[in-house]
Amino acid sequence: MRSRYGKAKATSKPRARSKSTSAAASPALRRPFRGSYFKTPKCILLGGLILRPPNASERVVKTTKKKMRRPSAKSSPTPRKRKKRNAHMLGVPAVTIAVAAASLALPTTMFIAMPQTITVGSFFTGMAGCHFSCQDIPGRDFATAFWVEKESVARKFLNANLNVQGFHDVCDPSFLADAPHTDFVIGGFPCQTFSQNGRKAGIDDPRGVLVVFLLIYVRRSLPRMVLLENVKNLMMAHMETLIDILTILKGIKDPETLQPAYFVSFRVLNSMTHGGIPHHRERVYIVAIRKLRRAIRFVWPGPIPCCSPASLLDRDRVKLSSYDVLLNNMPKGKTAQNNVRRAIEQVRSVAQSEGKHEMHYLPIVDLHSSALNMSLEYLPCLTEARGRARAFWSLAHGGPLSTRELLRFQAFPTDLAINVSAQQIGGMLGNAFTCSVVRRIVEQMVRAAEGRT
């Protein structure tokens, strides 16, 4: 064939149109993606592509030689029946549709029972709050397979109360080599470096990165459930560290499907509202549950009624007849004495305004606080420093809370083998879980792991 300028014009056979050409010609993908497409409920996110089904007024033209255009306004007003559109008409490759259909065909709820005896790996064990939290969960037995603890005082306590394998250092390579596989991993990683009362060094403190070794174990062992705990300030002042932990957990892949292995969620819970204990203790809880080719429906435990402080105090304690008795027998230390005086003044003011006797209340006051830290209805947050110093006093009884009372305010059993001093057990309780909160979370985790809602 010759062109108008006399030169031969090369001719070629028209290429066969492939599926990808048809997909590229679809109006669903040719139109630019504007913000309105993301707001419509008909927008579909699939395989990383944002797809918008074609409008009823759009007409898909299969030929590539003609331009796609909207029908003019002069077209017949009679509404046409909308034709059923196949997958290729939405601009999605057939392979993508097949993979998506296979994933959507998986059951959203599938019962995969946990073993009757759930083995537990305890990190940063301390007082073994994880062990005592799971003892009363109905329908399941929890057996601690190992614990990891570096503090010598805590190790002494653990050896007297848990007859299981113990490891000294989570950073020791022999730990990762020798630690057995478990169904459930739990750990309250060191909080001093993230606490509002500490130096707030975060991951710049060597203790701030110890959680990484727990995550390495999770990556290698792939337990069915993981529960982490730390102070609320982790979410407030160290949010980047919290995000890193969540990202690492979400990035762990299932070796069979190469998809994310865990459902991950976190929430701040208060022991007073979610543990039924009059103890104002807010903590961040991070939950991870193995998906095992199904969707996880985990529901955080809701608020429950709180018991009264009087129910947790020793019954043999005798209340003072008047605060004048306490004013004549003040504790040692200028700060402690000032806090007692201010607390008594506040209690008397409240009693006068409510028309009650001043000894009607059971106030608990922190003697070592620079500002008055007292409550008539609950225990202020127990920390390691306050627990070690036995700083919390029952004002109505004129003395510090006993070890048994502190155990009850953390929902621990009181029949433990206590082979350390009262100051040491108080400091350990300041670092411990509130057992009733952890128990309720674990119950929900087991239900979600088995596909029960």
Model-flagged regions — what are they?
Residues 1-47, 51-86:
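Arg/Lys-rich, intrinsically disordered low-complexity tails that mediate electrostatic binding
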Residues 106-107:
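Conserved alpha-helix/loop element of class I SAM-dependent methyltransferases that forms part
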Residues 111-225, 232-240:
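Core alpha/beta nucleotide-donor-binding catalytic domains of modification enzymes
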Residues 127-128, 190-194, 232-233, 274, ...:
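Short, solvent-exposed loop/turn segments at secondary-structure junctions
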Residues 173-182, 192-381:
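Class I S-adenosyl-L-methionine
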Residues 338-453:
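C-terminal target-recognition/interaction regions appended to catalytic cores
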